[in-house]
Structure formats: structure tokens, C-alpha cells
Amino acid sequence: MTFVPLSPIPLKDRTSMIFLQYGQIDVLDGAFVLINKTGIRTHIPVGSVACIMLEPGTRVSHAAVHLAATVGTLLVWVGEAGVRVYSSGQPGGARADKLLYQAKLALTEDLRLKVVRKMYELRFREPPPARRSVEQLRGIEGSRVRQTYALLAKQYGVKWNGRKYDPKDWEKGDVVNRCISAATSCLYGISEAAVLAAGYAPAIGFIHSGKPLSFVYDIADIIKFDLVVPKAFEIAARQPAEPDKEVRLACRDIFRSSKLTGKLIPLIEEVLAAGEIEPPQPAPDMLPPAIPEPETLGDSGHRGRG
């Protein structure tokens, strides 16, 4: 039998995400499995998932992390209901040319403004006002976002006192804020997987800054009111017994029906292309790789075969 080396498949061909909790994650007989306390194994198709959210109660073996990295699947360790990210394994972001391109766009003020204006246009489906700084555009954006929250609350008959929650005390927040937090966390997970698969850095943002996922927030904010926030209000209006669980399942279905995994990388490239520059070429005196990376079917940011 011929052995076929493992390699990533494109993000567009993957399921968006799954959540795992209460079990040991390991590789047995070559398969990525979750083993519960009674010893029952659940096979996880790790190579066909963009992002695996690991909730409290999970333990992960070295072999499982290695396999996930080899096939380009993002592992994210999260808190209760997936709303607090503790750490993540980065299977992508492996393109120096794209990282330098992203950094130049973020550090050059006029280029950054072009990118931010494009984000505004995509988010609100209209060109931003002319002759506005990034700070001014952020102010306009913030006002429109608050109005959108208020309109959604009115539409679904939900009491709304503003966007606020305590990440250290999940149960303290009201139902609608918990639903929104759970929904946006799902979107952040799949958005981070896309940023890494495309070869970029999650931390180098254009509107957000100072966070490990600044660029992820930038990208997710473009689409969150089209996809997940209305669903969060809809679920909150029903007052279900387990709102966060319902939100996660609904987000999974939305991501599948909207084919989001196939749209995120083109969205990222469209946003950055607004800067109207080309990715930098290596300096003439730089050494090429001694051992070139093998060609794979994966996206440009994936690290290839392990």
C-alpha cells in the first residue's frame, strides 16, 4: 500500500468549526480522536475542519497537536461557552512576504487609511465620507454599530442596555449579551483560521490594535452584523435554557449555508488590496531556502507537511 503524506486542504473545502469538551484528545491508529471518561472514542475528521475549539475539560496529547498542525487545522483553547480565548496553535501565517506586506500597509498612514476605508465600505455597503481620518471613521462606525444593536433589539423585542459583559463572570451577563459573545467568538475562531491560512498575522490590525487578534477582529467586524449578531438576538428573544449552545449550533449552520470558509480569504485579500501596493520581493542578497517547501493543496499560509 502506498503511503500518502499528510498535507493541508484549502480552507474553502472545510467545515467551519467544532467544539470539544470533557475528554482526552489523542491520535490512535492514525486517527484524531476524543476519548471520554468511559473510554468511548469519537473520531474527529481533523483535516476537514478549519478550527477546533477546545473547551474546559479537554486534554490534548503531543501527537494530536502535531497532527492538527500538519493538516493545517487551528486549535483554540477557550473558556466557558467559547467566549474567552486562552491560547491557540497557529498552523498558518507562514509567508514572510505576506507578513511584510501586511506590516507595511499597517505602518504607512496613507495606506492604512485606504484599507480602513475599504473595510468601512464593505461593512456598510457604501463609501465612507471623504476626507476623514481613521479616528473619525472609527467614531462614525461606533455610532452606526450602536444604532444597529438598538434596531435589532427593537426588531426582536429584546431589552437592550448596551453591549457589556464580564468575561470573568459569564453567568453575570444578560442573555442577549451572552448570545452575542458566543456568536462573535465563533466568528473570531473561523476568521483567525482564515487569516493564518492566507499567510497573514492575526495581531497586525488596522482599526483594532494592541491585541493578539487585532486583524481577526477587523475582518470579523465586516461581516458579523450580516451573519451572527441578528441570530444572537433571535435566540436571546426565545430565552432558551442553554443560549450559548444554541448560538454555537446556529453559527455552525450559518457558516455552512453561507459557505463562509470559501469567502473569508478572498475578503481578506480584497481588504488589503485597497492599499494598492504589491507584496515586497526578497532582497537580492537574501538566501533562498536550503530545502524548498513541497507543493501542497493547502492555502498559501499553511506550513505544508510536518
Sequence positions of predicted segments:
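Glycine/small-residue-rich interface belts in oligomeric ring/scaffold proteins
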Residues: N36, I40, I44-A96
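Active-site helix-to-loop segments that bind/position phosphate- or nucleotide-bearing substrates
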Residues: T2-L6, D13-R14, Y22-G23, K37, ...
